[in-house]
A protein has these predicted regions:
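Conserved helicase motor core of SF1/SF2 NTP-dependent helicases
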Residues: 4, 9, 13, 23-54, ...
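Short coil/turn segments at secondary-structure boundaries
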Residues: 28-29, 151-158, 189-197
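A basic/glycine-biased coupling hinge at the interface between accessory DNA-binding modules
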Residues: 47-187
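Amphipathic alpha-helical surface "interface" segments used
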Residues: 133-143, 160-164, 199-201, 304-318
Length: 470
């Protein structure tokens, strides 16, 4: 069904899960969640009734990867991002403009700033309006992702994931006024964070037969509660909704609860997978040490790997005196490794990706840059470049994570604009966890100058090396 990929052990049980109701599958990195999601999708699509099946994920690169390994001609199986689904559905009910339907983040910040300036003039003595605009952007985004539409809803709301931002209950009314004014000012009907709410509302009054009998969400931890609610509402009442997620990778999210997301698991058990089919025990041990950091946000649903299939060397951390020396070593190492294995270089942002790409090109290396239109494959001997976010769900034989220097990682701009430095550091640390757990064999990390405060330096599950001696 998936080329030479076959379900192993407990994974086979996912194929026999009921074709009705809600199912939640949680697993460690490397436990095969994406593989299980695809097996379930193909199994459902091949039922005698030939039901329509939708697989939804957040990451464009992962869409390309899933489509490639599925390699199926099943016309009743679709794989797409949430926002493609949302635009398509709203278009089907005549609610998606041909142009300027969705406001971009820059436009969102502009209109919120306009609303804030107007409020300052109208209520000059109100101290709430002296808070940074980033606090208002984040709070409005929280309201959108949780589908809050009235002041009463907001006043009653449990601010999941926002506890570190101190907003007194009596001051919530001022944030809601900015939210109202923002919605009144913008000319676009939606932004990227509230489009799920409008999809959900349209579905509530849509009496047409549902297009999809079964919907499967992969990398579900990246979805907001309203995204999940809207997808559940889009499923035929006699169909099924399946959620596959890794609670150790709550990067974008809302730290969503099952209740807030509309997932009914009272009558369904949560499936937990702790067998790691990707990472060697050495890398899993190092990844576990990342989760032991004081910066890590603890989660009661965390699944710790207990069994390991692969074998491999310890991860290695290499220190260089200068950035130039670090980059020179990276070029030579990648050149050698590319002849026999799949390799990915994971960087913090696109600017660093571009810098590394130029250096590689000058030295005769032509890397493939992973983005929403291009995935990476462990079976292809090649060199890939990716950001931390774009590499989610993918795997490679060798992973290189350069520039783990304190002035680069964590991202200083992210910290400066954060409403909660504690939360921002937790999210940055989870990026390192994601990157490290992409490896099927080798994990090479490097830095110049001072090592990042987020690196688990006290771990005994990695080796150190001095780049000047290599």
């Amino acid at each position: 069904m998936l080329g030479n990929i076959k379900p192993e052990g407990k994974q086979k049980e996912v194929l026999a899960l009921p074709a009705t109701g809600h199912t939640v599958v949680l697993g460690t990195a490397g436990s095969g969640k994406t593989t299980m999601a695809l097996f379930r999708a193909i199994g459902l699509a091949n039922l005698p009734s030939r039901p329509n099946v939708l697989v939804v994920t957040f990451n464009g690169a992962l869409i390309q990867y899933m489509s490639a390994i599925t390699n199926t001609s099943l016309r009743n199986l679709r794989i797409e991002t949430y926002h493609k689904f949302a635009r398509g559905y709203l278009n089907s009910v005549g609610k998606m403009p041909a142009w300027n339907g969705i406001l971009n983040p820059e436009g969102k910040e502009y209109y919120i700033s306009q609303a804030l300036e107007a409020a300052k003039k109208r209520w000059p003595e109100e101290s709430t309006f002296k808070r940074p605009i980033s606090v208002f952007i984040d709070e409005i985004t929280f309201m959108e992702r949780f589908g809050i539409e009235t002041l009463d809803d907001y006043l009653r709301a449990e601010r999941i994931g926002r506890a570190s931002v101190n907003i007194k209950r009596e001051n919530r009314k001022w944030f809601y006024k900015i939210y109202e004014e923002y919605r009144a000012l913008r000319v676009n009907p939606y932004d990227w964070d509230d489009i799920a709410l409008y999809v959900y509302k349209e579905l509530q009054s849509d009496t047409r037969p549902r297009l999809y009998n079964h919907i499967i969400v992969d990398e579900g931890q990246d979805f907001s509660p309203m995204m999940i609610k809207s997808l559940i509402a889009a499923v035929d009442e006699n169909g099924s909704f399946s959620f596959f997620g890794d609670v150790a990778q709550q990067i974008y999210g809302s730290r969503l609860s099952w209740r807030d997301s509309g997932i009914n698991i009272r009558d369904s058990k949560i499936w937990r997978f702790d067998k790691n089919y990707r990472n060697p025990a050495t890398i899993s041990a190092f990844a576990k040490d990342i989760t032991g950091s004081v910066y890590w946000e603890k989660d009661s649903d965390m699944v710790t790997p207990t069994n390991f299939i692969a074998k491999g060397p310890k991860p290695v951390l290499i220190h260089f005196a200068t950035k130039e020396n670090e980059l020179a070593w990276l070029i030579e190492q990648v050149k050698t490794s590319a002849l026999a294995s799949s390799n990915v270089v994971i960087c913090r942002n696109r600017a660093i990706i571009d810098e590394v790409n130029r250096a590689f090109t000058r030295n005769g290396i032509t890397p493939t840059i992973i983005n929403k239109n291009q995935a990476g494959f462990a079976s292809v001997k090649d060199v890939y470049l990716s950001t931390f976010h774009a590499v989610k769900g993918l795997e490679f034989e060798n992973v290189f994570i350069p520039f783990l220097s304190d002035d680069i990682f964590p991202d200083k701009e992210i910290l400066e604009n954060a409403t909660s430095v504690e939360r921002a550091l937790a999210d940055e640390l989870k990026l390192l966890y994601v990157a490290a757990t992409r490896s099927k064999y080798g994990l090479f990390m490097s830095y110049h100058g001072t090592l990042s405060q987020l690196f688990p330096e006290g771990s005994t599950n990695y080796d150190k090396a001095d780049g000047e001696d290599l």
